[in-house]
Regions:
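Sequence/structural segment immediately N-terminal to covalent heme-attachment motifs in c-type
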Residues: 6-29, 43-46, 159-162, 167
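Electron-transfer interface patches adjacent to heme c in soluble/periplasmic c-type cytochromes
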Residues: 39-164
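An acidic- and aromatic-residue-enriched active-site/binding cleft used to recognize and process polar
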Residues: 23, 28-31, 72, 103
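Electrostatic cytochrome c docking/interface patches
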Residues: 1-19, 33-34, 38, 63-65, ...
């Protein structure tokens, strides 16, 4: 699938936070080919979409919504919506039983691990260019700063290096 690209460094860090916090326990990332799912979440998932997921994040339970198409088309939510949702989920989704993650606003992204993660994924076949590790954190901070600026426009002041930024 030509539209499938390796994770950006910020997305890679966010994926690892997602795994660390056990988000996959309540959220799936695979839309099954059932009418009820495609009407709610969009086009069903294809096997090739997961070629760079290690470990895969399909999930097996849906306490929360499927996240495979989150951030696209009708499912797109603003950066400040996501920030507020991580801080206090029930304030953004009435009846949500998702726990709050206020510590994500305090903890810094582990940028010291970025190069090793990219190197490991390259060994597994992810097509990161040789030497990409040398400027990956610069790219990570550029993307993170863009999110930080979007949050600032919404009145939210937070440094670009916080873990919540990697999950938005």
């Amino acid at each position: 699938i030509s539209s499938v690209k390796p994770y950006t460094p910020l997305e890679l860090q966010g994926r690892d936070i997602y795994v660390r916090e056990g988000c996959y326990v309540c959220h799936s990332q695979m839309i099954r080919p059932f009418r009820s799912e495609t009407e709610r979440y969009g086009e069903y998932s294809k096997a090739g979409e997961f070629v760079y997921d290690r470990p895969f994040q399909w999930g097996s339970k849906r306490t929360g919504p499927d996240l495979a198409r989150e951030g696209t088309d009708k499912l797109k939510k603003s950066d400040d919506w996501h920030f507020r949702h991580f801080r206090e989920p029930s304030s953004m989704s009435e009846g949500s039983i998702m726990p709050a993650y206020p510590f994500l606003m305090e903890q810094k992204i582990d940028t010291a691990s970025t190069a090793a993660k990219i190197g490991a994924l390259r060994k597994l076949g992810t097509p990161y260019a040789v030497g990409y590790e040398q400027f990956a954190n610069s790219e990570l901070m550029t993307q993170a700063n863009s999110i930080r600026l979007n949050l600032k426009i919404s009145g939210i002041e937070i440094p670009a290096d916080r873990e919540v930024i990697a999950l938005i």
